[in-house]
Amino acid sequence: MDLTQIQNPSFLKDMSISELEGLSEDIRKFLIEELSQTGGHIAPNLGVVELTIALHKLFDSPQDKFLWDVGHQSYVHKILTGRAKEFGTLRQYQGLCGFPKRCESEHDVWETGHSSTSLSAAMGMALARDLKKTKEYVIPIIGDGALTGGMALEALNHIGHEKTDMIVILNDNEMSIAPNVGALHNVLGRLRTAGKYHWVKDELEYILKKIPAVGGKVAATAEKIKDSLKYLLVSGVFFEELGFTYLGPVDGHDYEKLFETLQYAKKTKGPVLVHVITKKGKGYKPAESDVIGTWHGTGPYKIESGDFVKPKEVAPAWSAVVSETVLKLARADERIVAITPAMPVGSKLEKFQKEFPDRMIDVGIAEQHATTMAAGMATQGMKPFLAIYSTFLQRAYDQVVHDICRQNLNVFIGIDRSGLVGADGETHQGVFDISFLRHLPNMVLMMPKDENEGQHLVYTAMQYEDGPIALRYARGNGLGVHMDEELKAIPIGTWETLKEGTQAAILTFGTTIPMAMEAAERLEKAGVSVKVVNARFIKPMDEAYLHDLLGKNIPILTIEEACLIGGFGTGVVEFASENGYHSALVERMGIPDRFIEHGSVTKLLEEIGLTTDAVVDRIHTMIPSKQKRA
């Protein structure tokens, strides 16, 4: 079937099971071929082909509402709703988004990117439906990994209490990105092996109704048998106790079983949870056999061999530099522990996990818990290293404020994927952390200019015992600089001059330092002398350095790959104002006040005007012509 000719999912209504099976093969082949060129979340989507087709066949989107939790598994949904022809632009600038996007299609009713939000949003839609007295189905699709998130559990509790009509699809592939962890994961494991609970329960109820009423004792005994059945079949029956009708487990690749169960769910009042067992990566052997999450999301790859197409790496990944330095220090200090919320592979903590399994803690998709747990460990003299992506640290903000900073606890937060991350787009750009951390009392915030300084700042963080400290580091690789053998502590709140200059100064840090250096060198050739400062401590700033610089009364430009509002540049402006430098000319470059879409980092930087050319032009406008050297 030519998938690019699909306009909407209505064509599925008249297709037979054998035709649907052929369509499944076509979609898997299409995904494997297309994603080999663009990269993307291949394994999650290969696992939900039949489930997605079944949902679109039995329900009527967009009247019926599908909410894809996390959203990385929505590619099949996009194909069935008329977007196959755009897959060549997947996750590229102004191309097809890798997650549901409301402006992209009327079938995308809820935007996602972070996990565990679908149930709360679905509850909101269902309550709105009931208030408006309409009849559409609301169907959140959530994975077993996302179900461990606290927000999802809060929603389950509320939905079950209110008995709201809703069909929750639990897509259980036993993984989130890496293998799942936790007690709920173990509950699901027991459910997988327990058989079809709801069918057996219905049969028993039918039999019990046939028992003649020969006395209260028999009736009471029969009722107890019925009430106790779930405990005989499944230990806990977690979802039934929460107020859901539990259906399953059902084979998520068997159309007959899917249709039977979903039709049953459509007729059932109140909240229903359909437990669907799927195989992540199904239909492509390299992805299907992956047990650690390598094929969860990938770049381009060779279909035949399963080898990834990667540019030759000339420098280590930032995540590896940080995690390996932490590991090196952990060998000499038993108090150091590593904590991750379900990202051991992305944060490059596999080596730490292998060497110190008892000191490496993966809490699952539970950022709030991870953060406060780290705080608790710090109260007992441990040295917790919390490795967390910038975008996911947003989810634990209150815990950082209330539990870590307020108590001034020695927690080292490794803020991975800081700055623009590219193809994953606006839900994943790490551009807000400076603004939401800089104003917190007791917080120290750093970002290195290169991987060598990065390892020294990790050492600095582990030696620091006066409160919380955080290190920002980018996605991707470092610069390939020489790495010192001996680690050293860098004095807190100190900056360094990278290039001397007399007519203007650029204050920056991290990934924008090469941009600033190149701009300064070009300006030098044009007769403009510009100082470049490595402001590696975003907080506390180097106040002595700032006093000296502001006293020279030369233009100052701050550059940051982070949002301008409340950012580093704002801090410099505040310092100048509060210290009486009222004639100081301080201008800022950074991320404007909007969400930044998906695309390559280079393209996105061009789009927002954060380039070497833009820096050169800005400095020229800041310096009067009469001050420029001939």
Curated annotation (Swiss-Prot):
Residues that, per the record, bind thiamine diphosphate: 72, 113-115, 145-146, 173, 284, 367
UniProt xrefs under PANTHER family: 1-D-DEOXYXYLULOSE 5-PHOSPHATE SYNTHASE-RELATED, 1-DEOXY-D-XYLULOSE-5-PHOSPHATE SYNTHASE, CHLOROPLASTIC
Residues that hold Mg(2+) according to the record: 144, 173
UniProt-listed Gene3D superfamilies: 3.40.50.920, 3.40.50.970
Disulfide links within the chain: none
SMART domains given in the database record: Transket_pyr (SM00861)
Pathway: Metabolic intermediate biosynthesis; 1-deoxy-D-xylulose 5-phosphate biosynthesis; 1-deoxy-D-xylulose 5-phosphate from D-glyceraldehyde 3-phosphate and pyruvate: step 1/1
Stated name of the protein: 1-deoxy-D-xylulose-5-phosphate synthase
